[in-house]
Amino acid sequence: MDNIYTPQTLAAVVRRTPDVPSFLKDLFFKDTKTFLTETVSFDIVKGRRTITPWVAPNSTAPLSQRTGVTTTTYKPAQKKEKRSITENDIKVRLAGEQPFVGTVSPEERAIQLLAQDTQELKDNLVRSQEVMAADVLLNGQAHIKGEGIDDVVDFNFTNKETLAGNARWGQSAAEIVANIIKWKKKCLKASGFNPNTLVMNSETLEVMLSDKKILALFDNRRTEMGLLQFEQMAEGAVYVGFMGGQIQCNVFTYDNYYVDPTDGQEKEMVATGKLLVASDMAKFTKLYGANTIIPGEGMDFVTYEGEYVMRRLVTRDPDAAFLELQSRPIYVPFDVDSYFVADVL
């Protein structure tokens, strides 16, 4: 049975275990880069869009300066979790296993447990990265908080606004269409990217749709009896439709929650009143530092490059084994001026 826990086998199991679908992570953070070191390096672009100048015949070319690029080196903290495997686990029928139908050997059940535990551990890790994606997009920073660590990676995000008084959506002086057009133009001017995506939760959408000007901009093909026809997507995400006119954006709601391991409280991914105006064409990147571990008994330290690394740990008296999955992720908005966040309620 030990052969299923070799570093090579565990690496293959992790690779073949699918990621749980994630809305913000999958929609925006499409690029992935891994490092052979525990530290990662990334660039943040802020600056004007320059053009090539005219020059007189036979003149030398002027020197182009690299402006607006900030390079940062950072050592991501580890995210890791383990699942225990005891003698009783491989002898007792698993959930969903048919009773009294054939006999499942401990060896076969160990293989089933490996697949099940890997999926659940990876699901937890992917969900935690979805929380990081939300933090980066909605707050312009990654707050790394856990046992023995409380760190903030600030990406110098400045495209944000809080509406006040009667200018808030749903109030008498609200100008929802004008607000969105203004925020889109600000992103376009600063980054060159024209936002094509709006994300909010369902409560914020309800207020937005109370504006007749907004409702009139949605694609008529998605409207029946005056009501929008929604399309379910990843967990908690709904495609509302395409908003035309001067806005030209796909509209999504995202109602998803997570339990914060630091305080045990259930929290929203996208808070009520938050609006994300973004382009899914801009560069948002998932970076992963390397993990250095002792992969098995009698082995030396080994450094692994990749998104995840899994190993088996063993304790004696009482005898128990643990399956541990770990990662060093940091999510980075390379084009930090390409999106805008507003508090609209």
Regions found by a protein language model. Name each.
Residues 1-41, 332-345:
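N-terminal alpha-helical "arm" segments
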Residues 26-27, 181-185, 307-308:
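Short alpha-helical segments and helix-capping/turn motifs at coil-helix boundaries
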Residues 31-99:
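Assembly/oligomerization interface modules of large self-assembling protein complexes
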Residues 32-33, 187-192, 197, 312-315, ...:
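A general structural signal for short secondary-structure junctions and capping/turn motifs
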Residues 45, 95, 156-158, 278-279, ...:
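A structural detector for beta-sheet-dominated domains
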Residues 79-156, 179, 186-203, 319-327:
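Long, contiguous amphipathic alpha-helices that act as assembly "spine/axial" helices in icosahedral shell
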Residues 150-227:
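Extended, solvent-exposed, turn-rich assembly/linker loops in the middle of proteins
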Residues 215-345:
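Sequence/fold signature of self-assembling virion shell proteins
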